[in-house]
Amino acid sequence: MNKETGLTNLYILAFTHRNLPVSEIGDLHIEHDLQEDRLTKFKSTMNFGELMFLSTCNRVEFTFTTTDKVDTKFLQKFFHSLYPNLLETERHSFATNASIFSGLTAV
């Protein structure tokens, strides 16, 4: 079996001080007591096989598996589904500034 076969559908979206001001990264934080409900619904909406959310003082990361193509349309749905209260310009900023890793580079 090819090593990458099992990783083909693995993605990481990362937001750090390298690609966004820390104040904007904070807009992606989800309070601990809301995470289970919001992320469970989000995982179902996006049809993810797996989903992990990491939020620290200067970083937010989403690790997930999907068979969907991760492109601009996907990212628009991603941010609209999880952060419906963000302005369109904010969602666009997050979508265009995300560091996206996939397959072996996500490991």
Predicted feature descriptions by range:
Residues 1-107:
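N-terminal ligand-binding/catalytic initiation module
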